[in-house]
């Protein structure tokens, strides 16, 4: 038996087998969790059903987080099928391409800001609020994926950095709000990983090289490492951890000065 046996978890954001969310689903399945999945784009529906089947799940639901009725429909379906929910993974983020390339101000606009914050940030507490009745009395856990670009200026990350900064704050406020119900809220800040989402960030390959050169472990990280950390945070083993941003980045966040050639 794994340490998530008996847990019912919802995973969002699985787009490919290179997604961090895929690594999370893989680890949670290994540890015995029962999983459900959502997708935001019909293009990925059939692919996701295939992934879900690998993890013993036939619960694959549409959920565009900009549409409250779709969130409500997921709540209704999971309530019918499971009754309760032991946690969810918020792996959702988007910013218009022009706002995550080049100079910050040149790509900055009101529309891009609204879009990035609505999809990437608002959706985390919105899902927590929607799922709250299902999570009460279950020592449940909420988990999101953030990035160091919400704390420090990272080239080209730009408007998404603003969204991640707000997402980090949302994690802390959710921890405070949900704690009285015994529900935890945390975030994983993974280092750069070659995912479909990351491919949209200009200069991403350079970020990988910088991390490999300067992270204390001298390498990048994998979706499996992020997944193992997520499985722990979603489990009762992490019962005393909430409001935390857990770095899975080979120690890169701890380095103040980059290594330079003599």
Task: Label every PLM stretch briefly.
Residues 2-37:
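Canonical Rossmann dinucleotide-binding motif of NAD(H)/NADP(H)-dependent dehydrogenases/reductases
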Residues 3, 83, 219-248, 253-254:
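C-terminal substrate-recognition "lid" of short-chain dehydrogenase/reductases
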Residues 8-12, 88-93:
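Conserved hydrophobic beta-strands of the Rossmann-like cofactor-binding core
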Residues 13-20, 93-180, 192-194, 252:
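Catalytic loop of short-chain dehydrogenase/reductase
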Residues 49, 53, 159, 180, ...:
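A glycine/serine/threonine-rich, flexible loop-to-helix segment
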Residues 63-72, 76-81, 90-116, 155-159, ...:
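Conserved mid-core segment of classical short-chain dehydrogenase/reductases
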Residues 179, 184, 241-243:
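Short, small/polar-rich loop/turn modules that mediate ligand/substrate recognition or access, typified
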Residues 184-194, 234, 247-249:
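Conserved SDR Rossmann-fold cofactor-binding beta-strand/turn motif
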